[in-house]
């Protein structure tokens, strides 16, 4: 248990930051799942539209250092490749 005033304040701040960061990490995962769901449905236009919105969300969360920028880029790249592959498989 924190005894000094500054230790109590740091504990409060850490709890608040943890709660906020957890919500943003959840938003990150939800954005990825939304695109994956559209890709699995096979609707390229809808998947591309959702990817645009999710891409912004992913970038914002990476800018806040909730996830590393390389992790965000990796997820965006894989989602974009999956959408592009969806177009190729639909054409064949």
UniProtKB/Swiss-Prot annotation:
UniProt-listed InterPro entries: Ribosomal_bS20 (IPR002583), Ribosomal_bS20_sf (IPR036510)
Function: Binds directly to 16S ribosomal RNA.
UniProt name for this protein: Small ribosomal subunit protein bS20
Sorted UniProt keywords: Ribonucleoprotein, Ribosomal protein, RNA-binding, rRNA-binding
GO annotation (BP), single: translation
Molecular function GO labels: small ribosomal subunit rRNA binding; structural constituent of ribosome
GO cellular component: cytosol; small ribosomal subunit
Region (Disordered): 1-25
Family that this chain belongs to: Belongs to the bacterial ribosomal protein bS20 family.
One Pfam short name: Ribosomal_S20p
């Amino acid at each position: 248990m924190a005894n000094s005033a500054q230790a109590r304040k740091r504990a409060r701040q850490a709890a608040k930051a943890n709660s906020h960061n957890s919500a943003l990490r959840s938003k990150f995962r939800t954005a990825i799942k939304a695109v994956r769901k559209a890709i699995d449905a096979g609707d390229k236009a809808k998947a591309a539209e959702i990817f645009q919105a999710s891409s912004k969300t992913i970038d914002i969360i990476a800018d806040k250092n909730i996830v590393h920028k390389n992790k965000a880029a990796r997820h965006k790249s894989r989602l974009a490749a999956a959408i592009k592959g969806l177009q190729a498989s639909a054409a064949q």
